[in-house]
Each structure stands twice: as structure tokens, then as C-alpha cells.
A protein has these predicted regions:
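Function-dense linear segments that define catalytic or interfacial modules
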Residues: 1-22, 26, 30-33, 43-47, ...
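A glycine-rich phosphate-binding loop feature that marks nucleotide/adenosyl-phosphate handling sites
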Residues: 10-16, 56-64, 88-90, 111-119, ...
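Polar, glycine-rich mid-to-C-terminal structural blocks
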Residues: 70, 79-155, 159-162, 336-340
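Terminal amphipathic helices with adjacent charged low-complexity linkers/tails
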Residues: 91-95, 100, 112, 120-124, ...
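Internal maturation/activation junctions in enzymes
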Residues: 230-253, 279-378, 447-450, 480, ...
Length: 530
């Protein structure tokens, strides 16, 4: 298919790197090869309606990384620009620590430092220091040296300008991987939520589904019994899907069959907390994220362990961290130890009644699936089912939708319902529409309601980090975490993304800057809320 593909290009030798097979010849670097893929992915369309989707991943010790940062810029030679594919920087803990310490960052030719691509954590740091020593002694053909903070700044300036490259943390992903016995994870996928190892014999495949959290709210409370049923059913459905999958290449079929990886996610988080009367940037919402993701994680793991009893464990189970009785939350401590810096997120259970020790003993006996959870962005299917996408805050309270039948206005039904219950909907309706859904300046609306119905750009960016950090504790793969910023202050942006790393996020997705976004209003006059 032409779905959401991730491609690591870190192994491609540097521009100007000597070729052994060509007398006096040298490599043209990663760009021309990436350009071939960029063009190819556009040529392959799904149903003739949607072009292919690809994200290139590069580790930032590659000497061509500065050129990689320019791939998504509009200006410049089209030959060195990627018009279809996306880009993501695969960053190590060593790099982040060098940024914090004000140290230099060295970039190398992978032809001389190939093992850096395969190692992680402290082992990477030791080997990286070895190559720095060799470079300083003149024992490497080519290298570059820049202040680490300067390169970090360049990454984030590019991110602000083009929304690329997305920031993904290699060591956080690999250190916390419960399927770490099957190799190094070199990349994520298009949407930065999949974390699976891959090599020439195994092309990673993940089978996804998303639960609508908002459909599990009854009388302003979570219907935990119904949610448990949904999680267990989804795990069984995805496991059944693996058995009937028809994949285009044998390497993908092999990986799918031997690892049985799935990624159960959620949508409607913002919709759910609105119904529960919580503001996205409140401690209540963060604790709720902690509890709901812990619950989903527990039930998904338990059902996979049940399936292992019924149908057998996945082929590569023995030797995995699952087989040693680990569950996702246990890897937070492992990450802190590997970094030598404590991950700044609480790793305690928040959901009473879940016996994790009992589940650890159960998991040790067998798991049907190598991975269980991954939170996709769900931008389209969230709209289709009438809820908010993934774990994102609501982008606007009023926006227009384009459908085959035409364009029409959509208003947040939770907001309308609350305002009607207060008896002020008719009084404030026109003001809300005129303000494009921004209710912050409308005097008749109580402050607690304004807090609940903040939109993406009026919500603190640190709230996005905190919600993701609370969820990531329990998720064995990753979360597609969009970020929304009003500020263009680069130091503030650096601080936000550094906080994300410190709190244990594995990845981030698009960065949306406020000046580039407006919610278009429908031209249809709205007299009544549907």
C-alpha cells in the first residue's frame, strides 16, 4: 500500500564520501536518493484520491544533517527539496545532554561510524566519545563540529518555519521497548506513534485501531465496565486481523506474523474532559489522562496475555522484556537509570483496583502481541465519528466542514449544551460565531466555562507535554503529539521541547504556529444549534 511509511536514511554515506567501487569517485549523499523516494511516493495513490505518505528519519550526528533541515523549505533548488515526504530528527540522549551542558556536537560520515546507527543509550555515548577522540586526532576523513545548542536551535527554527523536522527521541524509544530482543528501533512511522525494530529481513508492520473515549461517558462519569469491554474486544479484533492480513512483500508478512504488533489508541480525549467539566490545562485533566491510559493499558495487556493462553505467544516472545515480567510503567525507572537523569514524571499507579503485580506474573508466562498501544493522530476519523482527534485539544469551537453535499458550520456540541443548561445560549450565540468560537472575551459566560472551552492556541503548551507524559507512561509504543504555540520565541520553544524530553515523551508531531492558522467560518447563517 501507500500508507504511513517511515524510512531511516541515517545509514546513507555522506556527500563526498569516497566510494570503494569507483576509482576516485565519491557519494552524492542522501538527498538524491531521498528525492527518488519523494517522487515515487507521490506517484502511488490510494484509490486514485490520496497520494502516498512517507517520513524520512535521520540521526543528527550525520554530517549531512544541516542539509536535511532544509528539505522542507519552500525556497531554493527544487532538486534538494522534498515536496511530498515529511522529515523527522532522531535525537539521542547524548545530544540533549550536550545541549544542556553547553558542549559541542560532532557530525560524522556513517561510512566511518556505522555502528552509531545500531547502538543506544550509554553504549552510544561511549562510542560517540570514541569517535570524537578519533576526529580530534585527525583519524577520520570527515567530520564537523558545532555547539550542540546551536544545532538544537537550528532544528527548532526549521520546525517553526516549516513544521519540520518533527522531534523523535531514539534512546527513549529503544530503552523503553518491551520487544527489545528483536533489534534496534531506527525510526518511527509517518505519524510518530509506531516504535518497531526493522532490518532487511523484517519490514515492521503495525495494526491500528482507536477507541472513542467520549462514547464511554455516561451521566458525566466514565463507564469503566463498557470501556473494559471495548478494549478487550479491540485487542481480539486486531489479533484476528493479523491472521487475515494480505501484505505486499514477504518481509512485511514475516514481521507481522512473528511479532503480531498492534497499536490500540484513543480519540476524543478533549471531548471527554469537556463532558467531565475539566480544563485541558488543569491538574484534574492530567490526572484523568493518567488514570484512563493506565486502565486501557492494563486491560489491553491482560487480554493479550489471555490470548497467549488460548492461541500461543508471539514467536519472538522469549527474551523480550515481557518474558521477564516487565510492563510499560516499569521502563520509566529503566530510562532514568540509562540516562543518569531522573525522568520527571510520577511512575506510580493512579487507578485503584488494578493489580499490576498479578499482571506482571501473568505476562511473564506469555503474550500474544509484541506491542499493544500506540496513539495515532486520528485527524480524519475523529471528525467522521464526531469527536476530537487523538489526544489533541479542540482546535476551534466553531469551524466549517467541506463535504460532498456542501460546506456547513459546526459548533462544539458540548459547549452549546452547557450554555443551554445555563440558560444563556441564545444570548451569547451570535457573539460566539462572530468571535470564531473564542469565548474568552464574552462577558456573560462564567470563567470556569471559559477555562473548560479553551482552544488549541489558548491552552498552555506545557499542558500538551503533561498530558502526553502522563499517557506515555502506560503506552508501550508512542503517541502522536501535535504542539500548538502562540509564541515564536525560540528560547521558549527550546524550553518546551526540552521539557518534553525530560518528561519521557518518545516523539512529537506537527508544530502549529498561531499566525499560520485561522478557522474558516461558514457563510451560512446559523439561527439554531442542532
Amino acid at each position: 500500500g501507500s500508507g504511513g511509511i517511515g524510512a531511516s536514511i541515517t545509514k546513507l554515506r555522506a556527500t563526498g564520501s569516497p566510494l570503494k567501487s569507483s576509482f576516485g569517485g565519491s557519494s552524492s549523499g542522501p538527498t538524491p536518493f531521498a528525492k527518488i523516494l519523494d517522487t515515487s511516493i507521490r506517484a502511488v495513490q490510494r484509490g486514485g484520491k490520496k497520494v502516498g505518505a512517507l517520513c524520512f528519519y535521520m540521526e543528527n550526528w550525520h554530517i549531512d544533517f544541516p542539509e536535511f533541515l532544509d528539505w522542507k523549505h519552500n525556497a531554493g533548488d527544487d532538486y534538494v527539496r522534498m515536496r511530498t515526504a515529511n522529515t523527522a530528527a532522531f535525537l539521542s540522549d547524548e545530544f540533549m545532554k550536550r545541549v544542556e551542558a553547553g558542549k559541542d556536537w560532532y557530525m560524522f560520515d556513517p561510512a566511518e561510524t556505522a555502528d552509531l546507527n545500531e547502538i543506544t543509550g550509554r553504549e552510544f555515548s561511549v562510542r560517540y566519545a570514541h569517535y570524537i577522540e578519533k576526529a580530534d586526532k585527525g583519524e577520520l576523513r570527515m567530520f564537523k563540529k558545532v555547539p550542540a545548542a546551536e544545532q538544537y536551535r537550528q532544528i527548532l527554527v526549521s520546525l517553526q518555519s516549516t513544521s519540520h523536522p518533527w522531534l523523535v527521541w531514539k534512546d527513549t524509544i529503544n530503552t523503553r521497548a518491551l520487544n527489545n530482543n528483536t533489534g534496534t528501533i531506527h525510526m518511527s512511522n509517518l505519524c510518530t506513534e509506531i516504535c518497531l525494530p526493522q532490518d532487511k529481513e523484517n519490514v515492521a508492520v503495525c495494526n491500528l485501531a482507536s477507541l472513542n473515549l467520549a462514547a464511554h461517558i455516561k451521566n458525566k462519569e466514565v463507564h469503566w465496565g463498557r470501556l473494559e469491554e471495548s478494549v478487550r474486544l479491540a485487542v481480539r479484533q486486531l489479533d484476528n486481523l493479523i491472521d487475515i492480513n494480505v501484505l505486499p512483500i514477504p518481509e512485511a508478512a514475516k514481521s507481522d506474523r512473528e511479532n503480531r504488533a498492534m497499536g490500540l489508541g484513543v480519540m476524543g480525549f478533549a471531548d471527554t474532559i469537556e463532558q467531565l467539566g475539566m480544563a485541558y490545562d488543569s491538574e484534574h485533566a492530567w490526572d484523568f489522562a493518567d488514570r484512563i491510559f493506565e486502565f486501557v493499558s492494563y486491560m489491553a495487556i491482560d487480554e493479550s496475555a489471555n490470548l497467549a493462553v488460548e492461541r500461543g505467544s508471539y514467536k519472538n516472545f522469549n527474551g523480550s522484556m515481557w518474558s521477564k515480567g516487565y510492563v510499560p510503567i516499569d521502563t520509566i525507572k529503566k530510562l532514568s537509570e540509562e540516562r543518569g537523569i531522573a525522568v520527571t514524571v510520577d511512575n506510580q499507579s493512579k487507578h485503584k483496583g488494578l493489580n499490576w503485580d498479578l499482571l506482571r506474573a501473568k505476562v511473564k508466562k506469555g503474550m500474544r502481541n509484541a506491542t499493544l498501544m500506540a496513539v495515532a493522530p486520528n485527524a480524519n476519523i475523529g471528525l467522521v465519528v464526531g469527536t476530537t482527534p487523538g489526544i489533541d485539544a479542540r482546535f476551534a469551537q466553531v469551524f466549517s466542514r467541506n463535504k460532498i453535499s456542501g460546506k456547513y458550520m459546526d459548533i462544539n456540541h458540548n459547549l452549546v449544551k452547557d450554555l443551554k443548561n445555563m440558560g444563556i445560549w441564545e444570548k451569547v450565540r451570535e457573539a460566539i460565531i462572530e468571535n470564531q468560537g473564542d469565548i474568552s472575551s464574552i462577558p456573560h459566560i462564567p470563567q470556569h466555562t471559559k477555562d473548560i472551552y479553551k482552544t488549541a492556541f489558548t491552552t498552555s503548551p506545557l499542558a500538551y507535554v503533561e498530558v502526553a507524559a502522563r499517557a506515555q507512561k502506560w503506552v508501550d509504543q508512542a503517541l502522536s503529539r501535535n504542539m500548538y504555540l502562540e509564541t515564536r520565541d525560540i528560547d521558549e520553544t527550546m524550553s518546551i521541547y526540552t521539557t518534553a524530553w525530560k518528561k519521557g515523551l518518545k516523539s512529537t508531531y506537527y508544530l502549529h504556529m498561531k499566525p499560520r492558522h485561522t478557522a474558516e467560518q461558514s457563510t451560512t447563517k446559523v439561527n439554531k444549534a442542532e
